[in-house]
Design a protein with these regions (language model features):
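Phosphate-handling catalytic cores of nucleic-acid transaction enzymes
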Residues: 1-183
Length: 183
């Protein structure tokens, strides 16, 4: 239910990002056409369109380390991971490309996140990230997410557990002795 509070805003931001990206792609295409049609003697220089940020409110848990860092950079350091099943994040942590426990620990303290890759001479840095995480799940899903309290991730989460009296609810067709086809 909590995720629904910002769903409409997320849709608005996502739509705006997609529209900005489409407009950018159109401008790039027009820019390329102008360059091809210009004469070599034409000295006028046209600026290349600037690519807009692609912002989202919710960042999916099923995302790689590099992509979450990219989302945070695009969002100016902010993001929300909200999943109804905690094992979505737990399963990602088991993948080589998705182990971002250190990113979550650093984000909790708003410490700088950075990454550098040889390909394309890529450098990404997010100062003072504000990343919120809201998960729901069973105790077994939590143990899949946080296998040990030793790495510090456990202490950065608040857990809320409650007991519910288990009552059997008979959902069979004859449960209430009402024939629904004749009723």
């Amino acid at each position: 239910f909590a995720k629904m509070l910002a769903d409409e805003y997320h849709s608005f931001v996502l739509t705006a990002s997609r529209e900005s990206e489409a407009q950018y792609n159109q401008e790039v295409s027009e820019h390329k056409q102008k360059l091809h049609s210009k004469k070599k003697s034409d000295a006028a220089f046209e600026e290349v369109p600037v690519k807009p940020s692609f912002k989202v409110v919710y960042i999916p848990a099923n995302t790689s380390y590099a992509k979450i860092l990219w989302h945070l950079e695009q969002n100016e350091g902010t993001g929300i991971i909200c999943e109804t099943e905690a094992d979505t994040l737990g399963n990602v942590f088991k993948q080589e490309w998705g182990s971002y426990s250190d990113m979550l620990r650093k984000s909790f303290h708003h410490e700088r996140l950075s990454s550098s890759r040889k390909g394309n001479n890529e450098f990404t840095e997010v100062n003072a990230p504000s990343l919120s995480i809201a998960l729901s799940g069973t105790p077994n899903q939590v143990t899949g997410l946080i296998s040990s309290s030793e790495d510090g991730l456990f202490s950065r989460f608040i857990f809320y557990a409650f007991k519910v009296e288990q009552k059997w609810k008979d959902v069979s067709p004859n449960a209430n002795n009402i024939n629904l086809t004749e009723h």
